[in-house]
Amino acid sequence: MRNQQFAIRPTTLDQARVELQQIHFLDDTNLSFTTPSDLLRDFYDRSWPEYTTSSVVAQQLSNLMATPETDGLTYLTTHEQVPVDVFYNLALQRLGFAVDLDFQLTDPLAAMTKIQLPVADHEGTTFTLNELMNAWYVLLTTHNKTGQTFLDQLTTHGYFAPLIHDNSVPKPLIFNGKAQAVFDTTQLIHEVVYVESPQDTDHDGHRDLLKAEIIRPAETANGLKVPVLYTASPYNQGTNDEAGEALTHNVNVPLTAKQPAATTLADVTAESVTTPLPDARPVTATTHTAAETFAREQSYTLNDYFLARGFAVVYAAGIGTKDSDGLRTTGDPEETTSTIAIIEWLAGNRTAFTTRNATQAIPAWWSNHQVAMTGRSYLGTLATAAATTGVAGLKTVISEAAISNWYDYYRDGGLVVAPGGFPGEDADVLAEETFSRQLLAGDYHRIQEKWQHQLAAITQNQDRVTGNYNRFWDARNYLKNAKNIKADLLLVHGLNDWNVKPRNVNNLWRAVRDLPVTKKLILHQGQHIYINAFRSIDYTDIVNLWLTHELLGVDNHAETLLPNVIIQDNVTPETWQAYPDWDAPSNPVQHFNLQADELVAPSDHIPAAATSFNDQLPVDQFNHYTHHIDEWQADLLGDKHNAMFKHRLLFKSAVLTDDLVLDGRPTIDLQVAVNQPLGLLSFQLVDYGDAKRLGVSPTPLRIRLDEGYRWREDNLREFTVAATTPWKMITKGHRNLQNRTNAYQVDELKPNTFYDLSVTLQPTHYRLLAGHQLGLVIYATDFGMTVRGNQDLQYSIQLGQSALHVPFITD
């Protein structure tokens, strides 16, 4: 394994001593010790909280080897000094690394270097008392074999249990700039409130009430004010999976010609809708006691981790969900309004009630008015939407795999393009799936007619006929309001996420690059996933450092300690690199011209020529591919004379003599013609060369990774190397040939006439190894994403006028 820890805060010896005292590893007793071996023995005695007798603790120490010949108990009993190699022999074993398997007792420092574990500063071959204190401090921050810090490992064994009810222990308790698990998770308070939102989306003459589920530390009952992690999840109260499936659109339909129109941006700019708002409900009584509770929430494991560390957690599903008012809208300003209403209540700026009867108001009296939003996909999307309002109280957003513009989720370049894995899904399908008011028969009976009218409007306005950008999508483009962001941002995205494609995070990153907020970006090699339980990166520690700074006001240097950009390497397993930026404007660009079957240097002479392919497949082949998209993809990128040979164009570079690190948005300039007044092109950039590549889905390494003491659990995972493959798709893109100018203007397309076309592919960061070839595949129908009409469309490309441009960086 390889360990990368970005969140270890450099700490002076004086500060380390103070913090070790605060967590009870140092006290007046062991501070009086004069020999390093006695101090280390005492540290180890304290590190087995599950054993209460000294003889059993001694036995545990005797089970560790200090040298190839001597166990830990014997060594520390018979020696005064602690050699550096003895310290790390014992430490590696306590971290779960196996002698002879993971390291050799004759050279533990070699393993520390190989695994990339931190080694404490020391001047000689043995630790002084002060150096030993510092070394133990650093060890507590070091990751074990399962990706947890040693202190988190001790936490799961009950180290902090005696401190939970110790009034002398400060709460929150901070160690190495991070909050520690000194809160009683067996006594968490669960309560429900109904926040009154400034909207009436179901038009019943009353402001919408929104259900919020709150989990807060019991210590708040005694006056402690705590920060809040808020997850806005439209799935939280249940989903209508069968109804969504029934509404899913047929994608085996032909592409149709569009009427040319010189549509302008002003024509498609969404207009603010101002409708009279019902009066707020009168507040006649206020209480601090909730009237409703709940059992088990649909939790997010990262939130669970922080519940043990003194953060409150709030879940809300928003308008149009079970036990709330309103109608679903899929990402428009009304949904943003409902999202930030919860923040406004948590910040003390909005009213909530104890029940839906709205007779008693209840403030968030336990909140310190500092809120972070967390979540992946739709959840992270709403966090992004909330941030673009600049709402007071929202200090930071941790958004994973989030949409920044809904057009980029369901459309691309004037085409209906599905999120990967969900052909036929659209905004109306998602609205129906999340309209969980439908799960309550009585409530649905009262609202059904309004909902069906709303759903029909979404279906019409999303416009699957043209695929153009319009006012519907403009209202769902959060990038327009990125300038309003005041919250600091931690953005996380998968470079192989073809559900919420990388363009979403890239566009947001570029939009906030010059804003006066702290922003960080983590890009991993996965699909549409969470990364908070990965072994090779200290993501949970990063988030802890970040939230402790953002919500607790601790000056732990998170804003400068964490790199601007962290990117997982696609070649070497368990490797993450720090970068100053992603897709920087200053990146150099490598240019390739298109020649018959080749990508060549611009200096090469290219004779004028055209090459063609036909998109129409034999019926049996077409039908087979619609049910076996993986086989279509393999044939598309595979050997030259396979089943897709006449239905796509493939260009390969010469074999690379050096690694090429792609970084940013590849672009393609073409001259293209089609034999009908309609057409589309799709593109894939490909790494050709036999290699064992990382899988895009993580491998479970261990079940039940504890997040506290006798608390909830998560599954440890990691990207592992898969079997050898001959190619790997790097990135892709699509364009309607009638949207050559932009996504809203419809251009004329005359049959058999060549037109200039420039296409920007999805952004990437990818290391292409020496000995491999860069490939470009040009095709039309994308069986996983576009409509599939199987039409007789013949496409021609002018080779002498076509080129690929690839931004790159040098290591």
From Swiss-Prot:
Keywords: Aminopeptidase, Cytoplasm, Hydrolase, Protease, Serine protease
Top-level EC class as recorded in UniProt: hydrolase
Enzyme Commission number(s) from the entry: 3.4.14.11
Pfam families according to UniProt: Peptidase_S15, PepX_C, PepX_N
Principal localisation: cytoplasm
Key word Cytoplasm present: yes
InterPro entries hit by this protein: AB_hydrolase_fold (IPR029058), Galactose-bd-like_sf (IPR008979), Pept_S15_Xpro (IPR008252), PepX_N_dom (IPR015251), PepX_N_dom_sf (IPR036313), Xaa-Pro-like_dom (IPR000383), Xaa-Pro_dipept_C (IPR013736)
Any one cellular-component term (Gene Ontology): cytoplasm
Catalysed reactions, as listed in the record: Hydrolyzes Xaa-Pro-|- bonds to release unblocked, N-terminal dipeptides from substrates including Ala-Pro-|-p-nitroanilide and (sequentially) Tyr-Pro-|-Phe-Pro-|-Gly-Pro-|-Ile
Localization annotation: Cytoplasm
Gene Ontology terms describing biological process: proteolysis
GO molecular function terms attached to this record: aminopeptidase activity; dipeptidyl-peptidase activity; serine-type peptidase activity
Active site, renumbered: 377, 497, 528
Role played: Removes N-terminal dipeptides sequentially from polypeptides having unsubstituted N-termini provided that the penultimate residue is proline.
Subunit annotation: Homodimer.
The family this protein is said to belong to: Belongs to the peptidase S15 family.
The protein, known as: Xaa-Pro dipeptidyl-peptidase
